């Protein structure tokens, strides 16, 4: 799904680094997969993949399964990791992350 945007080796390394519960840190993950240095258009494409219900927002249930977008066998995020991730990205407090909020979080 991320072909042409992200390198498989970077994704594999990033997933390995947060394999244990409680170790997911979104900033480190975005850096490791190489997303931080990508164009706004590429970041928007990645958002579109993560936004599985195509609502133009990434909601809590989609965040919980965030890692599985990168590898079907990846773990779900814990409730605490999901809450931290949502809080970091939800700058307007509406309980979900829009594309601009996602881009700001990636670049952050």
Swiss-Prot record:
MF annotations from Gene Ontology: calcium ion binding
Q: Which GO terms describe its cellular component?
A: cytoplasm
The yes or no answer to whether the keyword Metal-binding is present is yes
Record: residues binding Ca(2+) 2: 90, 92, 94, 96, 101
The keyword Cytoplasm appears for this protein: no
Q: Which UniProt keywords apply?
A: Acetylation, Allergen, Calcium, Metal-binding, Muscle protein, Repeat
The UniProt entry's sequence similarity note says: Belongs to the parvalbumin family.
> Under which name does UniProt file this protein?
Parvalbumin beta 1
Q: What organism is this sequence from?
A: Merluccius gayi (South Pacific hake)
